[in-house]
Amino acid sequence: MKKGFRIIKFKKDKPVFQIKDVTKSYDGRPILKKISMNLYPGECVGLLGPNGSGKSTLYSTIIGEIYADAGKIILKGKEIQDQPVHLRSKAGIGYLSQQRSVFDMSVHDNILGICQFTIKNVEDQIKLTERLLDEFNLQHLRNIEASNLSGGEVRRLMLARLLINKPSVVLLDEPMAALDPIVVQDIQKYILKLQNYGCAILITDHQFNNLFDIVDRAYVLGEQSIIAQGTPSEILKSSKAIELYFGPSYRT
């Protein structure tokens, strides 16, 4: 764990989010086989696996873009696997996709516009907008059109907007993809700011080094199932995880 990254400590008493035996197939071909995991409030968890391992399918199943063939998805004690995307969002699931999902307006209005949909009091809308601009280092970009932002700046804006709906769980689909190493370190810092709000964080990635400095635990997907789980150091000792990434001939 890099010094200065951890913001709060999570309490591992009761999971805020659970996946139980989630299974998904396409045209009879299994993609996910009985996937199970728990997330706790304020915890940052990685979902690792090479391309084609099922990460994107699991991500889409959790947020409601597709439905599982079997299994349960539980948020704050309530089953949500049959709910569509908008109801899962309303229940407390926030998500950030790999697409550049911003409005064609200024950075300030990108945040304020969502605040206006979710907060009745105008003064509170303005206060939250300014707070998020400050916390995600966007004040100097407030009047810039979002379409003119760099990749890292867009990620910061998207992360800031996630917090407006007060999610209990945040899913981030490869948020550090195609970013320079120095920008990756910056985004890692802002991802962990979500913990200030008590969010449980699940981050997908296919690269170990993008996540291991910031996650508390990780799950590794391979062969349509979870082949390893644990702390970063435990994952690095897993023969199945090492073989998946480096091949059967690899030796530590």
Specify the residue positions occupied by each region the protein language model found:
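ABC-type ATPase nucleotide-binding domains, specifically the catalytic core motifs of the NBD
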Residues: 27, 109-124, 135, 248-249
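The feature captures the beta-strand-to-loop junction immediately N-terminal to the Walker
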Residues: 48-50
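Helix-to-loop junction immediately C-terminal to a conserved catalytic motif
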Residues: 63
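Conserved ABC transporter NBD signature motif
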Residues: 71-79, 91
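Conserved ABC ATPase "signature" region
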Residues: 123-141, 189-192
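Conserved ABC ATPase signature
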Residues: 145-149, 153
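Catalytic Walker B motif of ABC-type/P-loop ATPase nucleotide-binding domains
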Residues: 170-174
